[in-house]
């Protein structure tokens, strides 16, 4: 089953950013900029959920000094929750940022995932695949530079071999190739 899902996906299409600077001391229940968290994304990844006593905001001046500020007005990146076996992906709305419970997926090329591709991340089929890809881990399920490899985009037509992509880091970070298909 794992290999069958692999054949349906193109891997290694996103880079990932996770905020580690926004802490609860910077947040309030009102303010200039909305801070999205994992529970704000619906289970199907199609909408932002407003939750009383959960939603948070940050002062614009405090936000300007943080790395996540770069993504404030971007809607060409995508959001996915950390620490879950229920992945889902949605386009990031403009005028908001995220805390560390959400990862920002940044397309490596001029990729714009279709609705169908984003919906696939919320399917039971993908979620079972993701559990195997993450080796049924229970402690560290953060979306990081290695695990983002498995956020593959659904293909029109399946591949002959399950995983043919290489993991190559372009920023001169020494990162070995994880997979290489042997012919």
Predicted segments, located by residue:
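Polybasic, glycine- and aromatic-enriched phosphate-binding surface used to engage nucleic acids
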Residues: 2-183
């Amino acid at each position: 089953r794992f290999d069958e899902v692999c054949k349906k996906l193109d891997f290694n299409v996103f880079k990932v950013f996770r905020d580690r600077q926004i802490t609860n001391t910077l947040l309030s229940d009102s303010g200039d900029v909305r801070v999205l968290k994992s529970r704000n994304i619906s289970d199907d990844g199609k909408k932002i959920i407003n939750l009383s006593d959960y939603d948070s905001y940050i002062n614009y001046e405090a936000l300007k000094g943080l790395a996540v500020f770069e993504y404030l007005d971007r809607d060409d990146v995508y959001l996915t929750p950390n620490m879950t076996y229920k992945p889902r992906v949605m386009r990031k709305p403009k005028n908001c940022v995220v805390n560390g419970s959400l990862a920002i997926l940044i397309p490596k090329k001029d990729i714009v995932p279709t609705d169908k591709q984003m919906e696939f991340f919320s399917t039971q089929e993908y979620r079972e695949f993701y559990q195997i890809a993450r080796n049924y881990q229970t402690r560290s399920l953060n979306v990081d530079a290695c695990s983002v490899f498995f956020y593959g985009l659904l293909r029109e037509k399946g591949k002959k071999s399950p995983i043919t992509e290489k993991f190559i880091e372009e920023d001169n970070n020494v990162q070995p190739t994880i997979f290489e298909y042997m012919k």
